Amino acid sequence: MSTVVLVGAQWGDEGKGKLTDYLAREADLVVRYQGGNNAGHTVVVEGQEFKLHLIPSGILHPDKVCVIGNGVVIDPGVLHRELEMLRAAGRPLAALYISERAHVIMPYHRQCDELEEDCPESLRRIGTTRRGIGPAYADKYAREGLRVVDLLEAGAEERLKLIIRRKGEILGRIHRAPAPDPERVAQEYLDHAEMLRPFVRDTSLLVHEAVRAGRNVLFEGAQGTLLDIDHGTYPYVTSSNPTAGGAAVGTGIGPRVIDTVIGVTKAYTTRVGDGPFPTELKDETGEHLRAAGREYGTTTGRPRRCGWLDTVITRYAARVNSLDYLAVTKLDVLTGLPVLRICRAYRYQGREIHDFPSRLSVLAGCEPVYEELPGWTEDLTGVRSFEELPAAARAYLDRLAELSGVPLGVVSVGPGREQTLPLADFFHRR
């Protein structure tokens, strides 16, 4: 038995969905532990592309069990559409269970998110996905949220109407926005509750029993380390904990259950939305990375900001997640660039710093200190083992691992399952 946590080691969009799908072959359970439909995971199976936002990426393995944990915020309408999309594709699917403790995104959460992002004077305007994620988490921690189990309780209709009416009054006072109709929204969510009912379980108990029975469990994070509410580039962050610690809190298991933590990083760096980005490239190289890597958000379609690989970031991710391995994706995107750069440190006010700063003013003033390595011209998409990679590509990966202080565990050279080069056996470490 092994339990493996897969986390993003950058600003999200690192390719966790592809790797979750790949690693799910050896897992018995695939568990999503935080975030909502602000995350986008693209999985390619036999040439068919699936874009998922809520459902764990292991859903396309019919012999597995997929779990949406208590740390996730759920938009029932989005979940329903994803299930319908998967069923329409005609592929057999894994069993799916949803935590009864997971919180629910309401229409007023989405409305509030949009209003804050559209208000020029808003202090909360940070470039969100406008999906209501932040307001839903805010209500959770203010103890004003609604859990999945609350929608299934007797008296749910009256409680829904009361909360919707109160939230509508607040939206009207602060934003002068039209209030949602309590009758209509309450009925809509009661209908959603019936759709959810067959999937709802005490998933903490389900995962605990799987671990006790010696089954392999894969915990799938959304977003990335630098979007973590506590350890990310605050306030340009998400509203949950994508870091490895979030796997325990977001699923209801103890931290000592976790055996292995894998940090996923692209062979370069990307970011969506606002905030400092020391290695950002605003030139032809940045455009090349965006075009070759198809760097557009799965959820929003926004173009991603692109830059050179930053090992100040990967070292930081290694520290806050206790990374055992690195998984490097999109190595093939670097093909054709004559010279590659890796950021090994920052220079701030004349001195070199090697640790990621918490102050945004410092991060914004940092200049990257680069090492240069030779590129390669060979097409990597047909490579099927690490040894087949060009010498320059292997040297680049080795230096990435050395500067990060974490060994390589897997390398990806394309979106397909078969374009994955394993270097470690994650589920048989004990």
Curated annotation (Swiss-Prot):
Amino acids binding substrate: 298-304
Molecular function terms, GO-annotated: adenylosuccinate synthase activity; GTP binding; magnesium ion binding
Compartments where found: Cytoplasm
Superkingdom to which the source organism belongs: Bacteria
Cofactor: Mg(2+)
Pathway noted in the entry: Purine metabolism; AMP biosynthesis via de novo pathway; AMP from IMP: step 1/2
Keywords associated with the record: Cytoplasm, GTP-binding, Ligase, Magnesium, Metal-binding, Nucleotide-binding, Purine biosynthesis
GO cellular component: cytoplasm
Catalytic activity: IMP + L-aspartate + GTP = N(6)-(1,2-dicarboxyethyl)-AMP + GDP + phosphate + 2 H(+)
Residues that bind Mg(2+): 13, 40
Cofactor note as given: Binds 1 Mg(2+) ion per subunit.
PANTHER family, per the entry: ADENYLOSUCCINATE SYNTHETASE
Protein name stated in the entry: Adenylosuccinate synthetase
Organism: Desulforudis audaxviator (strain MP104C)
Encoding gene, per UniProt annotation: purA
